[in-house]
């Protein structure tokens, strides 16, 4: 099996939901369609996935082996920020990007604030009953979890996962990312207006059905 199972193939196995198209898997993984198509062909030839009115992983043991492979790879080479956004999709429980990440997703990566590459929390809304399972899942990738952002000096690596437990989840999707609803994201930005004024103005420009009444203009900096 491991002759076929490289990082891309393992991630594809983990990303597949029965009935998915190759294009949908590529969107979930944010990987070029042709790369995914070629890997799917190899996996199908090896008998690990089938394609009949959509993709299916033929045996749950294949998925378990893929998860073990990806987690082992992460323990050797820590995930990048881009990879960290994909990893939660390999879990067996629903989630939605929240807080700063909801703003990031709804602006399609156009607004980023309060994070640096060497200090980068990801914010995930999860169901209360799944908190322990998510903690164990991220631990297998050497990604620490907490309910509030932890100081950088207390962490060994720049990435951390901040879990926001909820009784239930309302999930929407933007470019393959599960995210809390747009209205809730706007409410979060209004509650933190000073930090997100420019993001609210960006929402107004991006979504024609919105009229948030927010204008923002960056002051010009004096040239040295």
Predicted stretch roles:
Residues 10-14:
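Hydrophobic residues on short alpha-helical segments
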Residues 4-8, 20, 181:
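Alpha-helix N-cap/N′ positions at the starts of helices
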Residues 111-224:
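Phosphate-handling catalytic interfaces
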Residues 30-44:
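Short amphipathic alpha-helical interaction segments
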Residues 2-8, 54-75:
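Short, cationic-aromatic polyanion-contact patches
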Residues 73-138:
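Active-site nucleotide-donor binding segment shared across nucleotidyl transfer reactions
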Residues 16-29:
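Short acidic, hydrophobic short linear motifs in intrinsically disordered regions
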Residues 44-54:
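A short, conserved structural fragment
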């Amino acid at each position: 099996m491991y002759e076929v199972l490289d990082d891309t193939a393992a991630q594809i196995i983990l990303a597949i939901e029965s009935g998915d198209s190759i294009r949908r898997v590529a969107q979930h993984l944010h990987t070029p369609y042709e790369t995914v198509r070629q890997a799917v062909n190899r996996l199908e030839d090896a008998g690990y996935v089938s394609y009949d009115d959509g993709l299916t992983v033929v045996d749950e043991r294949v998925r378990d082996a893929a998860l073990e492979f990806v987690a082992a790879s992460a323990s050797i080479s820590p995930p990048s920020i881009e990879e960290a956004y994909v990893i939660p999709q390999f879990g067996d429980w629903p989630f939605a990007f929240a807080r700063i990440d909801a703003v990031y997703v709804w602006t399609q990566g156009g607004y980023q604030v309060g994070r640096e590459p060497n200090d980068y929390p990801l914010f995930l809304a999860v169901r209360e009953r799944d908190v322990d399972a998510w903690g164990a899942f991220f631990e297998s990738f050497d990604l620490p979890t907490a309910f509030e952002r932890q100081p950088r000096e207390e962490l060994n690596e720049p990435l951390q996962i901040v879990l926001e437990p909820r009784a239930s989840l309302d999930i929407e999707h933007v470019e393959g990312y599960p995210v809390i609803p747009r209205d809730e994201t706007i409410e979060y930005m209004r509650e933190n207006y000073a930090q997100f004024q420019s993001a609210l103005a960006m929402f107004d420009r991006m979504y024609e059905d919105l009229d948030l009444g927010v204008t923002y203009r960056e002051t010009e900096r004096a040239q040295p």
